[in-house]
Every structure is written in C-alpha cells, then in structure tokens.
Amino acid sequence: MVSKLEILQRFYQIYLEQESDYFIYQEKFYYICRINNFTNDYTYYMNSLNLAGFTIVNNCFNRPVTMDYILYTYQIEDYHLDTFIRQSMIPIQSTVEIIKIKESWCKILDEAKCKIGNYASRISHFEHFVVLSYYYQGLGECAISILNQIKSKEIPAGIEHFYMNDSYEVLCCPSNFVVASRIKDLATGYKNNLITINELEEYISYTNLSTDELIYLYARLLFPGQFMKLAINDDCNDSQVKKRLLSIYQNIDNEKLILIQAYEMLSRYTYIPKIAWL
C-alpha cells in the first residue's frame, strides 16, 4: 500500500519528513484525504456559504485524483459558526430512519459494555472510568428510551459534520461532511459549549422543528457518544486516554447542567419524559 508521503513525493513533488493530513509546505496550507461521498458536492456547498473553502491541487498529470486521494490547498478565511449551523438545518431530499438510529445506539452501548467488562478487572483502581461507565451507560439507555416517544418513522436530513468545532479547518474540511439528521450539528454545537441555551432556542424557533425533531434533539444530547467512542476504540489504560477520561469526569456537573437546561427549555415546546436521577 502506497503511503501519503509517497503519493505527495511522486505525484506532487512535495517532500515531507512526517506523514500528516494537514501540513504546511513552502508557506502554503495543504490537506490530503481520500475521495468520499461528498467530494463532488463540496464546491457547491462552500459556494452556498460564500466561502472559497479548500481548493483541489492537480497532480503532475494534471488530474485531481491520485490513487483515490485528493490534495487540497486552502487559506483560512473569515467565517461565522452561525452560518454553518443554519446551513446544516436546511433539509435535503433525504431522511434518517429512527429505527436505524436506535439500532446504531444499541450497538454502540453493547460494544462499550463488552469492552468495559474486559477492562474492569485491570483498571479497577481507576475509579473515574468505573463511575463514568455506569453513568453514561444509564444516559445512553435513557436516550434510547426517549427515542420511543417519536411517532414518525423518519426525520429530515441535512448536510452535517462528523466532528464539530469552531475552527475553519474543521468546519470546511472536505472529509468532515455527512448526511445525517439536520439537528446533528445543532446538538453537537450545544453539547460542546459552542452555542448557549438561548442560542439553541433561537435556532429551534428559526427552523420551526417538528415535535419529533425536538424529542430527538434531547435524546441526542443525552446519548454519550464521546465517552462511548473512547471506551470502544481507545486503550483505557493509556495515560493520555486516562487524562481525557479524568477531564470528562471533572466536567460531569457542567454537562448535567446543560442537559437540565435543555430539558427545561424543550419541555416548554413538547412533552419529554423527565429523568429522575439527572
């Protein structure tokens, strides 16, 4: 398998000492990634935001694609997070099935429970992980239970981000887009403290979300995707992972507060079951 370093050397005459998706070469910013389902729509999407975004660099044969990879160059532009969130809430001609969301969440919880069980005897001294595992398993089960309140089989989809952060390189990254529920970015933005509870309510009013979308929004806020990803994919005995787990543990009170605030706000619009222990 040819590495990215070899591709850059052979097809772009770019010579790096270390492989990285983002890099600077001769004072220019670059990004290299595989082609994906959003590649052909990327330019149209960025134009709709009045941004240049990342621009394709043709290889030495004047072709945009090299062994399923594309090299981009970019310059960081002025942007507003608000523009991306509003764009993400525009429905496209696609929907997301509630049953598939439920199946996905159940699978994640099962995988995490299995992984946590395998670690339990070896990391029993690391109490933060044990406390977090019980807490987030409970939150995840509550989130799935709340999905059962949704009457529709499907909800509108939008162009969302895999990862959400208030950064040009994250928001405009050509490989960071996914078709998902049109409130994915909204939920992640609030959960990551990128927007306030008042701004969350403003977006809800602006978009006129359906009752089922409001219920799903709360369920999505509850579901502990970040912790479960750590539990499933990372070595929980690793020192860096332990630091991240400790950070999550220390932030639990703040996380509870934003969930309580979201519940109080959303329950003014529709009925949502209250979690007694939250």
Describe the role of every protein-language-model region:
Residues 2-29, 54, 61:
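ATP-binding glycine-rich phosphate-binding loop
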Residues 10, 14-23, 97-160, 198, ...:
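ATP-dependent phospho-/nucleotidyl transfer catalytic cores
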Residues 22-24, 54, 144-186:
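Active-site acidic catalytic loop and adjacent metal/ATP-binding pocket
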Residues 25-97:
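ATP-binding pocket architecture of kinase catalytic cores
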Residues 63-79, 111-122, 189, 223-247:
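A glycine-centered beta->alpha junction motif in the catalytic cores
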Residues 168-214:
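Active-site Asp-x-Gly
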Residues 216-223:
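Central hydrophobic cores of alpha-helical transmembrane segments
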Residues 228-278:
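ATP/Mg2+ or Mg2+-diphosphate-binding catalytic cores
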